[in-house]
Regions:
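A charged N-terminal "starter" segment
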Residues: 1-110
Length: 110
């Protein structure tokens, strides 16, 4: 077996997510895709109702491929390009964490 090798437990991931979700029943939990973009991990979280916090078009594509609803995707991060904002909007992602007034104006232009 080559390295690196990653072994994930779906049962453990689901259990930890559910304990966290039960601790904060009013919160919408969004996993930071930058923390782990493994499609199997994202699919497991999506099946549990988890949303996604993304910072790039690539992460948007991963979240959608995993089955996370665009209505549960938040586009965060600094330096979003106009093309990335346009792509997010074309995918029906309407939750943006805007990092500056300039970014807000750029989003308004898109």
């Amino acid at each position: 077996m080559g390295t690196p090798f990653y072994c994930y437990s779906t049962a453990t991931l689901a259990r930890h997510y559910q304990v966290f979700a039960e601790s904060f029943p009013e919160a919408k939990i969004c996993f930071a895709v930058k923390a782990n973009g493994n499609l199997a991990v994202l699919k497991t979280l999506a099946a549990l109702g988890c949303g996604a916090d993304v910072v790039s078009e690539g992460e948007i594509r991963l979240a959608i491929a995993a089955g996370i609803s665009p209505s549960n995707i938040i586009f965060s991060g600094v330096g979003k390009t106009a093309d990335e904002m346009r792509y997010a909007l074309s995918q029906q992602i309407f939750q943006f964490n805007v990092e500056s007034e300039a970014e807000l104006l750029a989003l308004n232009e898109v």
